[in-house]
Amino acid sequence: MVKFSIEKKTILGRLGKIDSWGPVDVNHATPSCMTYLRAGHIPHLTWDVAENQLKLSQTPIYQMTLPSLISNAKIIEKFGKGVAKFVGMGALESPAIHLSPFDPLGKLPSGYNDSKSIAIWTANGKVSLDVKTYRNTVNSFGCGSFETLVDYDLPRDAGHKKLLKAVDRTTTFNEQIFKQDEKIDGERIVALGGGFSKYHRRKCAVDIGLAENTAAYTVEFHEFVEGMETDEMEMKELLEETFSPLPPTKLRCISGPFNPKTVLFLVQQGIDLFDSSFAIKLAEEGHAFCLADDYPTSSKYEVVDFKDQEKFADDFTPVFDGCGCYTCTKYTKGYLQHLLNTKELLASILLVIHNMSEYDRMFKLIRKSLENSEGL
């Protein structure tokens, strides 16, 4: 089970703790984030580097993303020992793993879902994922939890007919995957959709969110990630409509590369668990970020582009003063810029280590702020 408890409610958000994730004891405080994996690894890091140089503040909950592994699904099933051992996580001590059918950094083009399947996008193109295939994949991967299928194809201009069809599809997928005569392993994290419509957000929540044995909820919000829709009032209203008919004690998750400002806002709306894809996205763009000294009192943060040759070529100061991560204690701005411009693999490794460390520190600061806030 996903054993979650709310320890404190404030106007700034919910302070909670995840005691177990599936069969694994984690003792993981929230708000926090899952550790985003691509092809079963933190992008650009080997497991040896991750264990020795990436010092996270809590026992990780790993987000295993399906698009990078779906082509190996039959091989993993034949392998018979689960996805963790297949991708080399066997050396980790009882990792807590969540299976997501989508990659938060992947594309989700419109127009490819149908009544029998959801389109996911891999390096080789579109794969249509139906319920039977997904159930078999969930069972063979052996993760502690899995996310249910949701029809995400609801752009802002979607009409009532399209919205209703998408919600009905999501409901049907849920009914089919949990058929009584079909076995499925792992805790269910119910994915809630509905696009930009408050009515359909609530309808989806009522139709599938009240089912028994629901371990947690995740909100489909890919239209609101950085660079796309960011209307905070609209986000607030959609989340209120989604969660108001649901049990308030369940864990609430969201997936996507949300920046520190948006994370702080979503925490205030009651979201408990995010993912670390924002840190990876920045690193793959040659960027590093640093929170303002007064975060989260203010939501400010700085993003530095280390591809800027003129600015950093002769700068031999630490990457970020005061940061205790491996990157900032061992390397300089000038050297990092040199690595990026010569396309050295070490550049991405160092940026991922720093950004992951800073994203982890961000949640630690948010939790400390909630601890010091007046309870409701």
From Swiss-Prot:
Entry-linked InterPro entries: QTRTD1 (IPR028592), Queuine_tRNA-ribosyltrfase (IPR050852), TGT-like_sf (IPR036511), tRNA_ribo_trans-like (IPR002616)
GO CC field: cytoplasm
Hydrolase is among the record's keywords: no
Main localisation: cytoplasm
Needed co-factor(s): Zn(2+)
Cofactor note: Binds 1 zinc ion per subunit.
Gene Ontology terms for molecular function: metal ion binding; tRNA-guanosine(34) queuine transglycosylase activity
Keywords: Cytoplasm, Metal-binding, tRNA processing, Zinc
Subunit structure: Heterodimer of a catalytic subunit and an accessory subunit.
Role of this protein: Non-catalytic subunit of the queuine tRNA-ribosyltransferase (TGT) that catalyzes the base-exchange of a guanine (G) residue with queuine (Q) at position 34 (anticodon wobble position) in tRNAs with GU(N) anticodons (tRNA-Asp, -Asn, -His and -Tyr), resulting in the hypermodified nucleoside queuosine (7-(((4,5-cis-dihydroxy-2-cyclopenten-1-yl)amino)methyl)-7-deazaguanosine).
Protein name (Swiss-Prot/TrEMBL): Queuine tRNA-ribosyltransferase accessory subunit 2
